[in-house]
């Protein structure tokens, strides 16, 4: 598929997603799922496949009025966030939704070790097939955790493998807003972080004094097979690190279309962020973004009243973007950046907007057929310190909103992609979000927003469950 054809297919996919038009294809599979892929949800204890299927069948057979959840990949994590998601599934979801179509994978560090990371490879394959994924926060083990958990090695973050496996183009991180509750930004802020390339896929070696030569051998074209020198330098330090990485630009066209399409839908002003004055190799990122905007979106932004006639797409240096995120508290803008800059800037975005718990995180990839693969998760980690307090018997108060927004996004996307019980799924997820927002407005939320009088983790879960029944 050529880049132009790919762009057209992606544009159609984005239009379908924005308009919420569902695919007519119903998901089916005859794939046999290994027993170790499925885990128990309460307390993190593993169960075999037959036990899990018995539970699924029981969910679907006892209440015909239950919503039928569309096929979705559910990735289990660990520590405090896994505990809270266990509660949410048992108290909010499973009494009302038949989740028999979900494929659940145990991505805890111990299971990755036990399966030699086969579970991660199976998650990626399932994600390609099903196209809708929810992932709980997971642990990337430190050296101390490797010893404590009895692991054979320090397994790397699964995120990079997922981004590559699903042909990731962007990680979307947006502000979450609750009417009547003051957070950071008054209006929505959208952020697109290039999902691949940069330091995250780097190779490195610790070295001493010597000569460093970086070479490249083209695999096609007139110079195929001929090695060329990219860089050559003397290292004079006794201790140094040599790092190599590359930035792929083929999928920046897809990133641009997705970013500008979302900004247009939300009616917010787009900005492109680089450090191209210093890092000259970042220039193509800006040029591609500007070309796609000028040729495909500029007139639409003017027609929608988001930009004025003659107004150009604005480039921001990453230094300036850092300041603008603090200054533009009114919100109403979008930014797109390289992988590393996007990582740093979205951390700042989260702090301005109260905490990472009020930021969404959505990996968007493109299937080989041109349709979108979407993986949803919280933008924060496993909250290990709070889990340690819970295990000591202390009260905790974890705000689950970021994780719930991820679950809502995954369930809605699954229903849209597979066209299964779509209307009831959207109605249920909307009610779930509405109830959470109501409780926060009434001062009955978790303590990060409601102070010492706020509810504990378990009290908040129960409060939402009661209103879902109302």
Curated annotation (Swiss-Prot):
Residue range covered by the transit peptide: 1-26
GO function term, MF aspect, one: protein homodimerization activity
Protein residues bound to D-threo-isocitrate: 157-163, 193, 200, 275, 319, 343
Regulation acting on activity, per entry: The homodimer exhibits allosteric regulation by isocitrate.
pH dependence: Optimum pH is 8.0 with Mn(2+) as cofactor and 8.5 with Mg(2+) as cofactor.
Cofactors: Mg(2+); Mn(2+)
Temperature dependency: Optimum temperature is 45 degrees Celsius.
Gene3D superfamilies membership: Isopropylmalate Dehydrogenase (3.40.718.10)
Presence of the UniProt keyword Transferase in the record: no
Principal location listed in the UniProt entry: mitochondrion
Oligomeric and partner information: Forms homodimers.
Function of the molecule: Performs an essential role in the oxidative function of the tricarboxylic acid cycle and respiration. Catalyzes the decarboxylation of isocitrate to produce 2-oxoglutarate and generate NADH to provide electrons for energy production.
Protein's name according to its UniProt entry: Isocitrate dehydrogenase (NAD(+)), mitochondrial
Organism name: Ostreococcus tauri
Gene encoding the protein: IDH
